[in-house]
C-alpha cells in the first residue's frame, strides 16, 4: 500500500445563519495514498465541493482535521496554508479560471511567479508543462483564442506546474463534451504515471469516475460506500 499522503479525520462542517444551522459534512474520514487516483462520486449538493475546500485549506472544518503528509492543517498559519497550496497542492475546477488578458504561457507561469521562482526557471517550466498537455504551440494565445478543451488543458498545466504531490479536481470535465472529457481524463492518467502526482477528483459522472483506481460515494454530506465501478457501462 502506498504511503498515506492526505488523511481526513472525522471532518464536520456546519454553517450557521442566525438561529438556522446547516450541517454540510458529517464525520467524513478517508485517506489518499501517494500517487493514488481517487474519485468521490455524488450528486449536486452532496457536499463534495465543500469537502475539497476543507482539504485544500480554503475553509476550516467545524470539527475534525485534515492531515497532509503527517502535518495537521489545524496547526498551520494562514501563510503556511497558502505556501502549502502553492507548493504541494494543485487545483482544477469545472471552470478554468484563466486570466483573460494573459497568454496560456503566462497563466501557467502564475503559480511560479507567486512562489518567487527565478525568471529563467519560470519560463522553461511553464513551457514544459504546456508541452506535457499538448499545447506548447498555443503558448502565446489568450484564453479567448482557445477552445473549451484547450482552456481546461491550460488549467491542468497551471495546476501541475509546481509539481504538486496532490491535485484536487472539482468536476474538471463538467463543462466539456464527451470527446473532450475523455481526452482530459486520459491526460490526468498520463500525468499521474509520468509524474507520480496523486489526484482526488469529485464528480457526479460514474463513467468518468471508473477511470480512477478507487471510488467513494458521498450522499448528504456522508461517505456511504466504496464503489466498484471497473467496467461499468
Curated annotation (Swiss-Prot):
It comes from the Bacteria. It is an enzyme of class 7 (translocase). Its EC number is 7.6.2.-. Its main location: membrane. InterPro entries: AAA+_ATPase (IPR003593), ABC_transporter-like_ATP-bd (IPR003439), ABC_transporter-like_CS (IPR017871), ABC_transpr_LolD-like (IPR015854), LolD_lipo_ATP-bd (IPR011924), MacB-like_ATP-bd (IPR017911), P-loop_NTPase (IPR027417). It is found in: Cell inner membrane. Residues 6-233 form the ABC transporter domain. The keyword DNA-binding does not apply. Disulfide bonds: none annotated. It is a peripheral membrane protein. GO terms for cellular component: ATP-binding cassette (ABC) transporter complex; plasma membrane; plasma membrane protein complex. Keywords: ATP-binding, Cell inner membrane, Cell membrane, Membrane, Nucleotide-binding, Translocase, Transport. The keyword Protein biosynthesis does not apply. One of its GO terms (molecular function) is ATP binding. It holds the Pfam family ABC_tran. One of its GO terms (biological process) is lipoprotein localization to outer membrane. ATP binds at residues 42-49. PANTHER family: IMPORT ATP-BINDING PROTEIN, LIPOPROTEIN-RELEASING SYSTEM ATP-BINDING PROTEIN LOLD. Belongs to the ABC transporter superfamily. Lipoprotein translocase (TC 3.A.1.125) family. Part of the ABC transporter complex LolCDE involved in the translocation of mature outer membrane-directed lipoproteins, from the inner membrane to the periplasmic chaperone, LolA. Responsible for the formation of the LolA-lipoprotein complex in an ATP-dependent manner. Such a release is dependent of the sorting-signal (absence of an Asp at position 2 of the mature lipoprotein) and of LolA. The complex is composed of two ATP-binding proteins (LolD) and two transmembrane proteins (LolC and LolE). This is Lipoprotein-releasing system ATP-binding protein LolD. It comes from Escherichia coli (strain K12).
Amino acid at each position: 500500500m502506498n504511503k498515506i499522503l492526505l488523511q481526513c479525520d472525522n471532518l464536520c462542517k456546519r454553517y450557521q445563519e442566525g438561529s438556522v444551522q446547516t450541517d454540510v459534512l458529517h464525520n467524513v474520514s478517508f485517506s489518499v495514498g501517494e500517487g493514488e487516483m481517487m474519485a468521490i462520486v455524488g450528486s449536486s449538493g452532496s457536499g463534495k465541493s465543500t469537502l475539497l475546500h476543507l482539504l485544500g485549506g480554503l475553509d476550516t472544518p467545524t470539527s475534525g482535521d485534515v492531515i497532509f503528509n503527517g502535518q495537521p492543517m489545524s496547526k498551520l498559519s494562514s501563510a503556511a496554508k497558502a505556501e502549502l497550496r502553492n507548493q504541494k497542492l494543485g487545483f482544477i475546477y469545472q471552470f478554468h479560471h484563466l486570466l483573460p488578458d494573459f497568454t496560456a504561457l503566462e497563466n501557467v507561469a502564475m503559480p511560479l511567479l507567486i512562489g518567487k521562482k527565478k525568471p529563467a526557471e519560470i519560463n522553461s517550466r511553464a513551457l514544459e508543462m504546456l508541452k506535457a498537455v499538448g499545447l506548447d504551440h498555443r503558448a502565446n494565445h489568450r484564453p479567448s483564442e482557445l477552445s473549451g478543451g484547450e482552456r481546461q488543458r491550460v488549467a491542468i498545466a497551471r495546476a501541475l506546474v509546481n509539481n504538486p504531490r496532490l491535485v484536487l479536481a472539482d468536476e474538471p470535465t463538467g463543462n466539456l463534451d464527451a470527446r473532450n472529457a475523455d481526452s482530459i481524463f486520459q491526460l490526468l492518467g498520463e500525468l499521474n504515471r509520468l509524474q507520480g502526482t496523486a489526484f482526488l477528483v469529485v464528480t457526479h459522472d460514474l463513467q468518468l469516475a471508473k477511470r480512477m483506481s478507487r471510488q467513494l460515494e458521498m450522499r448528504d454530506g456522508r461517505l456511504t460506500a466504496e464503489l466498484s465501478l471497473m467496467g461499468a457501462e
